[in-house]
From Swiss-Prot:
Keyword Mitochondrion included in the entry's annotation: no
UniProt name for this protein: D-alanine--D-alanine ligase
The protein's Enzyme Commission number: 6.3.2.4
Organism: Syntrophotalea carbinolica (strain DSM 2380 / NBRC 103641 / GraBd1) (Pelobacter carbinolicus)
Amino-acid positions noted as binding Mg(2+) 1 in the UniProt annotation, renumbered to this chain: D254, E266
InterPro entries reported for this sequence: ATP-grasp (IPR011761), ATP_grasp_subdomain_1 (IPR013815), D-Ala_lig_Van_CS (IPR000291), D_ala_D_ala (IPR005905), Dala_Dala_lig_C (IPR011095), Dala_Dala_lig_N (IPR011127), PreATP-grasp_dom_sf (IPR016185)
Chief place of localization: cytoplasm
């Protein structure tokens, strides 16, 4: 949509929600709402609870900017509701959102498209592990959580049992993944075009929830100090992943880089927009202010039928 058209519509920023990432979503949503207000849009903030359909109807929303993270916001649920309500929205559609939120489905899609990803096995609550368990160390993850919630790095059977117990506190489906030692990098993709690569260097050694959202806990190298050929290959791979999943608007693709290559870890279809978030940092590196980034994402709002 054009800027002039959007400035005549009622825009809702959907934030908060019901997931374990609620607090991060509120920070993302507030930052987006303030940016849109500065740019002259009519903005309503909506805390997306179970009464979201009623809130949308009551406020007369015409366009939705989705600033939700985690379940019921990033997994296709809200996207489906907005499709039913005929309200254009930002970001990826129902299927891409659902695929990217499910780490197991994402891994299978990456394998299908020949995109390198760490070896893995899958476990459902009360069942045996499906697939061959990679060698230790391993990373144990709830399949449908974000912000590193419920993740453990394990080195033996005892730690694996504890890691599975923690992961099952958050999900009935768990991904057990080969641990890749290397440099963690992230590539933002905006409307199908890659942004500069950021290398993530957490001071604690592991990029956990605290490192992500506490200022000063992580060093960000922008642009990532990588050989030119590798840098270009990572950007190309990020776009391939974006297209394979079927993403729209803005997304972020995370990789581990080793001496022998790189591996795709996961895809984030609603990247954070807080003061420590990576997508705004990458956009700023190419001269795009936070407000301009928010407007660019808003301009892509549509129905994904």
């Amino acid at each position: 949509m054009q800027r002039q058209e959007l400035q005549q519509k009622k825009i809702a920023v959907l934030m908060g929600g019901l997931s374990a990432e609620r607090e991060v979503s509120l920070r993302t949503g507030k930052a987006i709402s303030q940016a849109l207000t500065r740019c002259g849009y009519e903005v309503t903030d909506i805390d997306a609870g179970r009464d979201l359909a009623q809130q949308l109807e009551k406020t007369g929303v015409e366009v939705a900017f989705i600033a939700l993270h985690g379940r019921f916001g990033e997994d296709g649920t809200v996207q489906g509701l907005l499709e039913l309500a005929d309200i254009p929205y930002t970001g990826s559609g129902v299927l891409a959102s659902s695929l990217a939120m499910d780490k197991v489905a994402t891994k299978k899609m990456l394998c299908y498209h020949g995109i390198a990803t760490p070896g893995f096995a899958v476990m459902r609550r009360g069942q045996k592990i499906c697939g061959t368990l990679p060698d230790y160390p391993l990373v144990v993850k709830p399949a449908r959580e974000g912000s590193t919630i419920g993740i453990s790095i394990v080195h033996d059977e005892q730690e694996l049992a504890a890691g599975l117990e923690e992961a099952f506190r958050h999900d009935d489906l768990v991904l057990v993944e080969q641990f890749i030692a290397g440099a963690e990098v992230t590539v933002g993709v905006l409307d199908g075009q890659p942004l500069p690569i950021i290398q993530v260097v957490p001071k604690g050694g592991f990029y956990d929830y605290q490192s992500k959202y506490t200022p000063g806990q992580t060093e960000y190298l922008l642009p990532a100090p990588l050989p030119e050929t590798l840098y270009g290959a990572l950007q190309d791979s990020a776009v391939r992943v974006f297209e394979a999943i079927g993403c729209c608007g803005a997304a972020r693709v995370d990789f581990m880089v080793t001496d022998t290559g790189f591996y795709c870890l996961e895809v984030n279809t609603i990247p954070g927009m807080t003061e420590t978030s990576l997508l705004p940092k990458a956009a700023n590196a190419v001269g795009m202010s936070f407000d301009e980034l928010v407007e660019r994402i808003l301009a892509g709002a549509s129905l994904r039928k």
